Amino acid sequence: DLDYTTAITLILVGIVGGMVIAAIGSGGAFVPTPAMITLGAPGIVAVASHICHKFPKALVGAIKRNKYGQVDVKLGLVLGVFAEAGVLFGKHVMTDIKNSFGAVGTDLYVSAMFVVTLAIVGGFVFKDYRKLKALDDAGNGEEQAAPLTKLARWVQSVKIPGTMIYSKGAQAELSVLFLVPIGFATGFLASAIAVGGFIGVPAMIYILGLPAIMASATELVIAFIMGLGGTIFYGLEGVVDIRLAMLILLGSLFGVQLGAIGTTYVKDYQVKFTMAVIML
């Protein structure tokens, strides 16, 4: 049941989630999704409702950060197309679990995937933050450009005719063949446990070679596309609670404005530190 206390709690949760999605591009799923489960919503309803509220705030955040020149629109659109395929596959996995094991099964699935994903990605990002912080300190307070990983240099060096697109964020041509698995994995996690940005953002940084600021902003474009498709897919299953989605959206639209403004005052390594701390 939805009372006044629960409604206010969801709005506050939305504010925090909105700040996170604008700041680090992760969608902040680890905030509203567990909160909805804690308040009694089944795992599949929590994930579906989060996806429903995600695409409007992602659009707002993308437009806001594009004004600051932080969004690689072309890359975001291409990754978003492949992510939509992952969304559809993830939805089928979730509904199969629901049909086989009920609400308890979806709760366990969401919780287990959260723990594994956040631990692995968070640890990797925190390690990279320490390297960037050391470079920044060595530069006497002036922000140093993040060095490309060996993998990113290799990906940017591969030229496959007929598959290349120019990425403003990476300032290099990238093969679409490398974007397929990144987009699909991002979409799968977004649809299964609503945390696609935890794969998409680090992948754009460490595999494609985008700066953290641009990767987190570009993820908002992907989140919009995934959220729109996911809402339709889950809506057809009848598991979207529009009340939960709208209350969280109400708070997140305010929070996303604060988060977007905040990114103009932080350094690249500070974005990665925030990502790592929140994940872990």
Per-region residue spans from a language model:
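Membrane-interface helix-cap regions at the ends of transmembrane helices
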Residues: 57-68, 225-241
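Alpha-helical transmembrane segments and their helix-entry boundary regions
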Residues: 46-47, 76, 198, 215, ...
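Alpha-helical transmembrane segments in multi-pass membrane proteins
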Residues: 9-17, 21, 25, 29, ...
